[in-house]
């Protein structure tokens, strides 16, 4: 589909079925909000990140970035050093309890394979704010297949035992491992973050070279299909992919193949939106990502769009909004 046809069909569909989400007061649940104040906790990776991310990003900045949108957010851990996990989690829980922030819940960081993991989990289980946990699995220091190690599987099972979910942030080449992990942990609910790290540049090489951890389009699609089929309650977070494209050189249709495959494979009841701010700034301000996604889904039924933007997240995370 060429860009002109994409824009024409999207615009026409928007007039017939998407007016709800062109209104500024339509609720958006951002399931993937990052915050860091280096005076409190400094994620180690920030020092080597692109310059746009080598700053503090606090609630006031998030509010400014989302001006004009009716947003409530779920904090997403920022890959701090393990020694700072408790400090990070305690800080965001305190912010949520203060009630003066759009952040209403949290996915905290942790190490499921650690010996004291259950003690850590018990500290936050049942507090009403912490909904789950994640560990970044696509870093160079994490070996391939790590998520299937006995210690890791044991830890992820522990989350389900205490009513918490696990969010999968991993290499697209290992999505079939994710499907195996899900089957090994039947009592734990899962979210696949960032569309399984699908890279839009794999669909359109004109956008530039793909990431070193990228895979072929067919391999990524098979991985997404495997995760979706692994269990009927696995969710997919439509997030992260705008960070892969060059700023100012992409259009909504460049993201559409990744988004649409995830939406079609998981179905309208198993997807929700994530802003990935401020990491999204590698490709776009968060408003640019929101506008692009609205355009991509414009032809879908309004009820499905409501599920994507807010309804599914409210249900899955048990949010009170």
What is the predicted function of each stretch?
Residues 47-83, 101-111, 131-138, 164-166:
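Divalent metal-dependent hydrolysis catalytic cores, especially in the metallo-beta-lactamase
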Residues 32, 73, 106, 159, ...:
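Conserved, mostly hydrophobic/aromatic
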Residues 3-21, 26-31, 40-41, 47-68, ...:
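Mid-to-C-terminal alpha-helical segments outside catalytic/metal-binding sites
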Residues 28-38, 192-195:
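Histidine-centered catalytic micro-motifs
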Residues 83-102, 186-192, 251-264, 289-296:
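Short, electropositive alpha-helical surface patch
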Residues 36-39, 80-83, 113-116, 139-141, ...:
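Active-site environment of divalent metal-dependent phosphoester hydrolases
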Residues 146-272:
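Catalytic pocket-lining loop regions of alpha/beta-barrel enzymes
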Residues 86-174, 180-183, 196, 214-215:
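Active-site gating/metal-coordination segments in enzymes
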């Amino acid at each position: 589909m060429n860009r002109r046809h994409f824009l024409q069909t999207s615009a026409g569909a928007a007039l017939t079925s998407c007016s709800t989400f062109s209104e500024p007061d339509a609720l958006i649940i951002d399931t993937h909000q990052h915050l860091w104040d280096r005076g409190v906790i400094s994620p180690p990776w920030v020092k080597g990140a692109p310059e746009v991310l080598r700053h503090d990003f606090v609630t006031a900045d998030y509010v400014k970035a989302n001006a004009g949108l009716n947003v409530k957010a779920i904090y997403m851990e920022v890959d701090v050093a393990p020694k700072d996990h408790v400090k990070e989690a305690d800080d965001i829980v305190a912010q949520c309890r203060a009630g003066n922030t759009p952040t209403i819940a949290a996915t905290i960081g942790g190490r499921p394979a650690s010996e004291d993991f259950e003690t850590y989990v018990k500290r936050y289980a049942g507090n009403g704010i912490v909904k789950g946990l994640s560990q970044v699995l696509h870093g160079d220091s994490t070996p391939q297949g790590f998520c299937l190690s006995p210690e890791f599987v044991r830890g992820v099972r522990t989350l389900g035992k205490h009513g918490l979910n696990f969010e999968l942030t991993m290499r697209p080449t290992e999505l079939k491992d994710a499907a195996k992990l899900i089957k090994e942990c039947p009592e734990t609910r899962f979210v696949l973050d960032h569309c399984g790290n699908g890279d839009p540049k794999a669909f359109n090489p004109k956008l530039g070279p793909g990431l070193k951890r990228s895979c072929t389009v067919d391999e990524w699609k098979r991985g997404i299909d495997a995760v979706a089929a692994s269990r009927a309650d696995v969710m997919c977070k439509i997030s992260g992919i705008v960070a892969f494209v060059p700023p100012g050189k992409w259009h909504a249709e460049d993201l559409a193949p990744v988004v649409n495959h995830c939406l079609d494979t998981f179905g309208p009841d198993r997807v929700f939106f994530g802003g990935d701010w401020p990491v999204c700034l590698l490709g776009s301000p968060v408003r640019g990502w929101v506008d692009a996604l609205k355009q991509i889904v414009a032809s879908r039924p309004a009820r499905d769009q409501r599920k994507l933007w807010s309804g599914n997240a409210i249900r899955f995370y048990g949010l009170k909004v």
